[in-house]
């Protein structure tokens, strides 16, 4: 292919235009989204995933740590099996041994644990295609993590500033346990109110009346009422 191209142009002298962005790093997802309006669109979560690939987190060898790790590995295995993709650098055995994931993978994994615990809002999600499912899980995971760590949803690019919290012993277990607890409280509160009558329907709950961000706002209200996150632990 390169030899054919060289018959028509000199690749050594080819001028390739580029745009240099000198602003804050946390604004890159918005900048990229604006530049990419005419092409194949990537969500801001896909942009953040690429941007955060080097922000590593070591998960504890605990029930919650292992659940997060399984979600990350399972996601990649499904992408390989369902889309016939090759994922650069993915080695399931190596991940099991190191217990290392990155910040973006944490957000996805906690998002999937949350939607599984919140059937009243996202019970229909697992009947949808992989792309739609991943989009919703990303929204839930990234925004919930931002809420828990005191980062404005409009400034998700600042989440890496909180990485030092994840290196504090016991923090990840405490964070995951308390996040899931609040979502289970919300699930119990809305379960009877949104339950559809009859047993014949495949849908258990009337989910159309509550948008994703509305459900996330319920979590934000409870979280800020019950918890304060600092560099040492989560205070209740």
Regions found by a protein language model. Give the residues of each.
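Amphipathic alpha-helical interaction segments
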Residues: 30, 138-142, 213, 217
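Basic- and aromatic-enriched surface patches that contact anionic nucleotides/nucleic acids
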Residues: 1-123, 206-209, 218-220, 231
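Structured, charged N-terminal subsegments at the starts of enzyme catalytic cores
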Residues: 146, 150-207, 214, 223
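Serine/threonine-rich low-complexity intrinsically disordered regions
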Residues: 10-12, 62, 102, 129-132, ...
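Polar/charged alpha-helical tracts
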Residues: 3, 67-81, 97, 131, ...
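Short glycine/serine- and small hydrophobic-enriched flexible loop segments
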Residues: 220-226
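Conserved small/polar residues in nucleotide/adenosyl-binding loops
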Residues: 234-236
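C-terminal solvent-exposed extensions
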Residues: 119-160
């Amino acid at each position: 292919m390169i030899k054919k191209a060289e018959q028509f142009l000199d690749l050594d002298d080819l001028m390739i235009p580029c745009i240099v962005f000198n602003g804050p790093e946390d604004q890159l997802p918005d900048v990229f989204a604006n530049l990419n309006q005419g092409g194949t669109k990537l969500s801001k979560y896909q942009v953040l995933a690429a941007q955060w690939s080097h922000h590593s987190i070591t998960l504890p060898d605990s029930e919650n740590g292992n659940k997060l790790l399984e979600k990350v590995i399972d996601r990649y295995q499904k992408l390989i099996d369902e889309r016939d993709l090759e994922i650069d650098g993915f080695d399931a055995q190596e991940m099991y041994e190191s217990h290392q994931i990155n910040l973006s993978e944490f957000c996805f994994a906690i998002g999937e644990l949350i939607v599984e615990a919140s059937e009243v809002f996202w019970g229909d999600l697992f009947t949808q295609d992989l792309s739609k499912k991943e989009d919703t899980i990303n929204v839930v995971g990234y925004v919930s993590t931002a809420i828990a760590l005191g980062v404005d949803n409009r400034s998700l690019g600042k989440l890496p500033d909180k990485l030092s919290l994840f290196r504090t012993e016991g923090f990840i277990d405490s964070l995951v346990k308390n996040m899931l607890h609040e979502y289970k409280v919300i699930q119990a509160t809305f379960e009877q109110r949104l339950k559809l009558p009859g047993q014949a329907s495949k849908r258990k709950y009337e989910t159309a009346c509550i948008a994703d961000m509305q459900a996330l706002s319920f979590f934000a209200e409870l979280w800020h009422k019950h918890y304060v996150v600092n560099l040492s632990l989560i205070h209740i």
